[in-house]
Amino acid sequence: MMVIRPVERSDVSALMQLASKTGGGLTSLPANEATLSVRIERAIKTWQGELPKSEQGYVFVLEDSETGTVAGICAIEVAVGLNDPWYNYRVGTLVHASKELNVYNALPTLFLSNDHTGSSELCTLFLDPKWRKEGNGYLLSKSRFMFMAAFRDKFNDKVVAEMRGVIDEHGYSPFWQSLGKRFFSMDFSRADFLCGTGQKAFIAELMPKHPIYTYFLSQEAQDVIGQVHPQTAPARAVLEKEGFRYRNYIDIFDGGPTLECDIDRVRAIRKSRLVEVAEGQPAQGDFPACLVANENYHHFRVVLVRTDPATERLILTAAQLDVLKCHAGDRVRLVRLCAEEKTA
């Protein structure tokens, strides 16, 4: 049975294996054991209540409960940009006009922005390609909404998610090649690694401070503004079905889109509800896949089951209860996947 749980110190080697499979561009999952160990420690201290809000971040893993195999990772940053500036480009417009010459030009322009400072962030979503089946991607991505719904007071009113932009298998980013490299004088992979290992001072030191006309970029770079990496397209679709939208903010490195949504308008958060759980044999039928989560902050668990999403009393097997760390009579959080999201 696949289950979402909080990260543990012993997961570092499994996370290293996942990091080696990302293909680059996933800044928050570098193949660097020391950095990953620090990230795990920060998550543990967040759960223990030892960090200020500006440093808090939760990390979860997707595990096969029978074998202990870690198949994926996802995370939530509680409030971005309160220690180090959190940069985007806002894709806007500058107008240059002359009535005398009868010239009017509306030019797409990139403006350096810190507009999402303080927002909660969905990040570090990666599922091992071997496990991209049977609804595991939905479970991994949406489990964070179950945690946010259960512990709403831990998070801010806006949630953002940076989507990985267009990068090829060799680490070539058209957007970086045309823009970032001119200011940072390094390859994309080097900048990505420095950022992922916490060495972010160079961003503030070398970033272009003035608006940039996109027409000055190569056509290849212009074409990937706001576009996602092919492997990231499913993750974008999942978030958009939950209510997230692209509001013309992009990543400063690869030009990938930043999606955003008010936390209380996220479908899974808004529609999830608490029901009593009982032990027994679940009813058979053509029921939809639903997320089921306990309400245990320190031992949070989420699984995917097929059940009636309108039930007032959820029947689970002894094995399911055990994985969820629940007992008969406990209350669990329940919400169905979107109607079009299939797990077969």
Swiss-Prot record:
Q: Which Pfam families match?
A: AstA (PF04958)
Q: Does the keyword Coiled coil apply?
A: no
Q: Which UniProt keywords apply?
A: Acyltransferase, Arginine metabolism, Transferase
Answer yes or no on keyword Cytoplasm.
no
The protein's matches in InterPro entries, at most eight in alphabetical order, are given as: Acyl_CoA_acyltransferase, Arg_succinylTrfase_AstA/AruG, Arginine_N-succinylTrfase
Any idea which residues are catalytic in this one?
H229
Q: Which GO terms describe its molecular function?
A: arginine N-succinyltransferase activity
Residue positions annotated to bind succinyl-CoA are: L125
Query: How is this protein named in the record?
Result: Arginine N-succinyltransferase
Encoding gene per record: astA
